[in-house]
Structure formats: C-alpha cells, structure tokens
C-alpha cells in the first residue's frame, strides 16, 4: 500500500508517518500546499501542490492536520487538484469495533479505541489513546484529542474539537465547531461554536471553531 501525505506543514504529519510504518505502508510523497518547511522532510520526496502528476493523484491520500477547519480546507484543496481516494488510516495498535463505521479520510492513531456502533463522518481524527464510547455519532471533520474519552451515545457535531484528556459524560451533545478544552469534563450539552473549559465544563466564549477556523455544514 502506498500513501500520499497532503499538507505536511504540521508536526502531526510525523504521527501519520509512524502509523504508516507500523502498517507497512510506503509514503509515496509529501505534498506541500502552503509555504513553509515540510514536516517531516526526510520521509519521502516533497512535492509542491502545483507540480502533481497523474501517478501521484491515483494514490490514496491522507491530510495529517489536527485542526478540523484546516483539515477540511486541505482536503478540499487535495480533491480540487485531482486526488480522489481519501485513505482510512487505522494504526495497528488501535481497536476499532467491527460494528463501527469510519468515513472516508479517517485517521485513528495509536492505541485509540472506537467503540461498538460508533458512526464517524468524513475525515474524523482520533488521536493517541482516545476512547470513543459505544454508539457515539461524530460529524464530519471531528477531532478527538489524545486521551480524550467520550461516554456512550454522545453526539459530536461537524468540526468539533475535543482537547487532550477531555471527558464527555454519556449522551452529551457537543455542537458543530465547538471546542472542548484540555481536561474539561462535560456533563451538559455544548452549543454550536462554544469554547468550554473546566470541571464541570463552562462556556468561556463563543468562537468559530478550533484555531478560529470552522467547518461548514457541507451535507
């Protein structure tokens, strides 16, 4: 299996490289679509986005970015340039229930757990050691940070971001483009665009998504 890394401007690209290595996949190229040094530059040839050829465009690709809005924009950029095969990248140390469904472009990092009946939309990301409870529904481009835990039957909206070690009580809903801060404990529903922190989580402010960049409701 060969894989293209598209948008290699984030250190998180190194995580995708490690997962690919554990799977025995070859990194065919690292595509740089914005100015700046590619990270990591030593893994494969660095190709500028304006210099892609048909052979590369035929290879499955992944977008190794943690911010949902940036991942959405880079995925749209990749597809506009002719990539058509978003890879589902699952680390061999992760556990994904047979009854779970992962959308195109998903990345499940090392030792993450995706529970029974989970439904994840397009290009969702479960970072190291995250645990997504049974029958949880994730909208498109959701990011679940390292060590974050959701109880069963949670609903997480498009573009939402759960920070490192965040905890969601069972059946909690997190709105689209909301941000749950690192270590927050969420026991009540979180509105769209809200930034919540603390234990119990409280609204700090209204925002437009992690990093100030949201994901539109595309479907």
PLM region spans:
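Terminal amphipathic alpha-helical/low-complexity segments used for targeting or macromolecular assembly
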Residues: 1-92, 201, 209-219
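Structural signal for interior beta-strand "rungs" in well-ordered beta-sheet cores
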Residues: 88-197, 201-204
